[in-house]
């Protein structure tokens, strides 16, 4: 029978990113349509607005960022162990695009690619990441 890895069964979407051409227009659209609120992320090399889609425990948070050459939606999955998740990705035919990367005081992030060429993120919360 089909066997699903525990990691895949436990992972849940935790973050999304939407490419935009006009950040102010996009903030207005998503704010008006869905009630999302935004906070500009200081220190990012380009515009990066964090979106809050619901109260604590509801919805998932995401971001708007300047559209580059690849205007695609990015989904990030929350996992218990970034190392185990990366191993599972590569062990099942996927690839690592950007390895384990520190987000100081927040956690660890990696960008991967599935067997169909779709990019997605992995995130492990760890407030001691430094």
Question: Whereabouts are the PLM-identified features?
Answer:
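Vicinal oxygen chelate
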Residues: 2-9, 14, 18, 39, ...
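Acetyl-CoA-dependent GNAT
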Residues: 64-66, 125-126
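Short acidic/glycine-enriched loop/turn segments that link adjacent beta-strands
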Residues: 44-47, 69-71, 103-108
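Short, charged/polar, Gly/Pro-enriched secondary-structure boundary elements
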Residues: 56-62, 118-120
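Core segments of cupin and vicinal oxygen chelate
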Residues: 8-11, 17-59
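Structural motif
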Residues: 13, 59-62, 72-74, 107
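Mid-chain, well-packed structural core segment of small domains
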Residues: 68-96
């Amino acid at each position: 029978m089909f066997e699903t890895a525990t990691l895949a069964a436990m992972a849940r979407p935790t973050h999304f990113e939407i490419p935009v051409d006009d950040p102010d227009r996009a903030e207005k659209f998503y704010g008006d349509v869905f009630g999302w609120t935004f906070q500009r992320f200081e220190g990012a090399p380009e515009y990066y607005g964090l979106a809050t889609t619901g109260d604590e425990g509801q919805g998932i948070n995401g971001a708007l960022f300047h559209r580059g050459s690849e205007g695609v939606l990015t989904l990030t999955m929350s996992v218990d162990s970034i190392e185990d998740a990366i191993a599972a990705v590569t062990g099942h035919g996927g690839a690592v695009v950007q390895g384990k990367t520190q987000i100081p005081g927040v956690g660890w992030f990696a960008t991967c690619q599935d067997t169909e060429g779709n990019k997605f993120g992995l995130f492990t919360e760890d407030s001691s990441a430094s």
